[in-house]
């Protein structure tokens, strides 16, 4: 039995879910830090944050997040969640059914007849994160589209949208 397991009720309530953060590290100095609903709310949050000693003495966010979109019958369901001021979009947390954080952080999503499992694991001595998706159930042909948000910025800096 897992003591770090959260169900749909908590995961769909942002007031309860956003203050709960997860931090995973490896032996090379890299880390993954975000909220349990995968919404980066702090400037040091990121899916892959690593030290870059050739550049400076700071950690750098290389991969901010990885947005998943489930596509079925031409309909798209974005599983991502981003914070833009007081607005949260695209609100993919509503598809989370369960989150467990034992040895491997695991999130279960349900979108209609699709049940998708996501697991995140660090490689011990490398600046690398592995993400495995398992399609547990689907009643029809299903496509999973992945969209990485690359940052390559210091954890001390924010990046802003270009004005163009």
Enumerate the predicted regions with their spans:
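Terminal accessory carbohydrate-recognition/targeting modules of carbohydrate-active enzymes
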Residues: 1-164
């Amino acid at each position: 039995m897992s003591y770090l397991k959260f169900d749909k009720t908590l995961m769909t309530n942002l007031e309860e879910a956003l203050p709960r953060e997860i931090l995973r590290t490896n032996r090379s100095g890299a880390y993954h830090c975000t909220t349990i609903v995968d919404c980066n709310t702090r400037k040091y949050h990121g899916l892959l944050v690593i030290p870059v000693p050739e550049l400076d003495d700071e950690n750098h966010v290389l991969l901010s997040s990885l947005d998943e979109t489930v596509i079925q019958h031409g309909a798209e369901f974005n599983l991502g969640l981003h914070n833009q001021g007081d607005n949260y979009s695209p609100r993919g947390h509503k598809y989370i059914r369960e989150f467990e954080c034992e040895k491997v952080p695991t999130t279960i999503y349900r979108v209609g007849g699709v049940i998708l499992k996501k697991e995140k694991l660090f490689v011990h001595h490398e600046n690398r994160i592995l993400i495995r998706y398992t399609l547990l159930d689907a009643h029809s042909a299903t496509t999973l589209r992945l969209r990485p948000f690359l940052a390559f910025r210091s954890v001390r800096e924010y990046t802003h949208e270009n004005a163009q």
